[in-house]
Amino acid sequence: TVVTWNPLLAEVAATPKTSQLFNSSQIPGEIIDLMVVNTKTLADNPNLGKALTGAWYEVMGIMSSDTPQGKEARSKMAAASGTDLKGFEAQLAATKMFYTAKDAHAFALSKELPATMTKVAQFSFKHGLLGEGAKSAEAIGIQFAGSQTGNAKNIKLRFDPTYLKLAADGQIK
């Protein structure tokens, strides 16, 4: 049994007599690509949040476009991740991507996000990923737009939709 992810997964799957037991499409929303910034750093430098979000969605727009520039971007990303354009595009086709800030903002505001992160915290606790002192899955707090789960005095992860909203509304260029 091998646990891996793309691009290596595609190579393993091409090996004779292999079969896939599980993939992340079976746990939608549980594996999320994030841009993470220290809370104090972001509070002290809100323009950093705007710049990072703007750059993120500029790249997402380019890489998702059916243009020579989009193909070039995907080709460079493919090479950087150890595969070719065809392999990289196959990975993208099998991955739920938030190509627009509007879609990401809607996900950040959804009821599914706190429910999913609660399941992730439970899994993490069960497998000892919250640290030796954790007495329950609620040992850490996770903050969302208008709600939180876990320990309010020990917030370790914040899903702040502020910059997604600005980008979705066209206020970040």
Positions of PLM-derived features:
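Beta->alpha turn/N-cap motifs
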Residues: 3-10, 31, 38
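Surface-exposed charge patches
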Residues: 10-11, 122
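Ligand-binding "clamshell"
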Residues: 11-24
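A bilobed periplasmic-binding-protein/Venus flytrap-type ligand-binding module shared by bacterial periplasmic
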Residues: 32-47
